[in-house]
Swiss-Prot record:
This is Probable Vpr-like protein. Seems to function as a Vpr-like protein, since it mediates host cell cycle arrest in G2 phase. Cell cycle arrest creates a favorable environment for maximizing viral expression and production. Pfam families: Lentiviral_Tat (PF02998). The gene is tat. InterPro entries: Lentiviral_Vpr-like.
Length: 94
């Protein structure tokens, strides 16, 4: 019986801590350069919570499917290049 293709773990070293699978990193890299700033800031804020990372990728995939021909708005989608309320890392003591 033929086996379904498996997801490849990891991406580049700097992306290892953020996304577990290379496909997730590719999706984030593509979409984060094209989404409106408000959506990007919301996703950056959600990425600070490990439990919401899968939800961010799912929303990014849906956005990518709906906006397949979206123009590039920025060179990079990282926190350093896109300061804002979503880029501030929160220190919370429980």
């Amino acid at each position: 019986m033929e086996e379904a293709p498996r997801r490849r773990p990891g991406g580049s070293r700097e992306a290892e801590g953020i996304f577990r699978y290379y496909e997730d990193w590719e999706c984030w890299d593509h979409v984060s350069q094209r989404v409106p700033n408000e959506v990007l800031q919301r996703w950056l804020a959600m990425l600070t919570n490990n439990q919401l990372r899968r939800k961010v990728i799912r929303e990014a995939q849906i956005w990518m499917w709906k906006n397949a021909n979206a123009p590039i708005r920025r060179n990079c989608g990282c926190r350093l290049c896109n300061p804002g309320w979503g880029s501030q890392v929160r220190d919370v003591e429980l």
